[in-house]
């Protein structure tokens, strides 16, 4: 999961890469050491580590800003191409349809 987030950060040029790399090193080193040893003791300690969820929320907001372009255009928004609306009038220019055969 963190690998996917890291690739998104690289693509969108979001800062904080050193912090993420540092976190990844610690998770990789300690996974094998504590596997199955102290599951009961650590349950209460991990509840306080919800700051990581806040970081994800900030990351998602940054991604949404990149997609929608909020704040980066400085008032210059890209205008969508106006589609030409077909005028349905009495001028058919020789075209007929099945509904015209009354």
From Swiss-Prot:
Belongs to the KS-type dehydrin family. It comes from Glycine max. Residues 1-102 are annotated as: Disordered. Sequence repeats lie at residues 21-24, 25-28, 29-32, 33-36, 37-40, 41-44, 45-48, 49-53, 54-58. GO terms for molecular function: metal ion binding. This is Protein SRC1. Intrinsically disordered and metal-binding protein that may play a role in stress responses. Disulfide bonds: none annotated. Residues 21-58 are annotated as: 9 X approximate tandem repeats. Induction: By cold stress. Induced by heat shock, drought, wounding and infection by soybean mosaic virus (SMV). Keywords: Metal-binding, Repeat, Stress response. Residues 1-76 have a biased composition (Basic and acidic residues). Residues 77-95 have a biased composition (Basic residues).
């Amino acid at each position: 999961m963190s690998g996917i987030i890291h690739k998104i950060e690289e693509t969108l040029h979001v800062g904080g890469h050193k912090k993420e790399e540092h976190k990844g090193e610690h998770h990789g080193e300690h996974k094998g050491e504590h596997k199955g040893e102290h599951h009961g003791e650590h349950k209460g300690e991990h509840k306080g580590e919800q700051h990581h969820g806040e970081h994800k929320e900030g990351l998602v907001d940054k991604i949404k800003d990149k997609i929608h372009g909020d704040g980066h255009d400085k008032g210059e928004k890209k205008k969508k191409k106006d589609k030409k609306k077909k005028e349905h009038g009495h001028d058919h220019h020789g075209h007929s349809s099945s509904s015209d055969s009354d």
